[in-house]
UniProtKB/Swiss-Prot annotation:
Substrate binds at residues 21-25, 71, 148, 203, 316. This is Uroporphyrinogen decarboxylase. Homodimer. Its EC number is 4.1.1.37. The record marks 71 as: Transition state stabilizer. Keywords: Cytoplasm, Decarboxylase, Lyase, Porphyrin biosynthesis. Transmembrane segments: none annotated. It comes from Campylobacter lari (strain RM2100 / D67 / ATCC BAA-1060). The gene is hemE. Belongs to the uroporphyrinogen decarboxylase family. It comes from the Bacteria. PROSITE patterns: UROD_1 (PS00906), UROD_2 (PS00907).
Amino acid sequence: MIFVDACFKKSTPYTPVWMMRQAGRYLPEYMEVRASAGDFLSLCKDYKKASEVTLQPVDILGVDAAIIFSDILVVPLEMGMDLKFEKGEGPVFSNPIKTKEDLERLDVEKSIKNLSYVYDALALTREKLAHDKALIGFCGSPWTIATYMIEGGGSKNYAKCKKLVYQNPEFLHQILSKLTLALKHYIQEQIKAGANAVQIFDSWASALEEEMFFEFSFKYMLEIADFIKEKYPHIPVILFPKGVSGFLDNINGNFDVFGVDWSTPLELAKEKLGAKYTLQGNMEPCRLYDKKAIEVGVDKILNIMQDSAHIFNLGHGILPDIPVENAKYFIKLVQEKSKK
């Protein structure tokens, strides 16, 4: 698989390319399946439909990897939290974690069993996916998932979480440790079901100052990565901590690919991390609105990464109103222009 080879810094005939959120609302085919499922969570829980939308970008765009269709918050949901996706508001937990009793009620073992719809979707997708295409499993980072569990949803300033960082770090570490335990086994089950690589999304890494990022976020991601690499050395682990361009000097650990977001200069990431890791990213997603902007972005990134291990991706998820034609153009352009 060209994608897995690139993760391990092996030479590839061209630069493999996929997009975060590639199974998403910009695709009319996705919207059809989502409408038939009823709502977002029902789509996540229907393994046949989740598999169908996972495969759509491979068939329609020709990306080199599929990423399983799911959500990072299905883990706390199946641990016993009450999750709803409110229109215009995003995810909402009606019972956020406030006390040790709240935390004790969450059941790690039950969640691993209850998440069988994700493993079933992976198994079905791997069966249907072409042999040369990789299937990526994923989870959120413990820190990013915890922000939703503690705040009760998305947040502008993460005040409740950050209050714990400084006022009651011991309790926050207990929450993160419990989540880390669940995520290790969740990812292990994804690999058993057929995932060829795994990505850990730390979407809210940038909410923390440097010292606290390494204590409350990065440390736990590495714990998951270590667990996976020890058991499955042939499975690449991708870390994607968003907005940490100022912390790159201290990024180090047992993983294979570092995801670079669009706000981080790729030259900087290459200088600091390119020798150790394959870099993934990092085109500005809004370049996809315009074909000329796509060409300029692709040329610039391929030029920077021409002598380094690289997986092409956006620096964040594709937006819902991007024309499908432009997404196709982007994928084909990367594959053509990067031919060795």
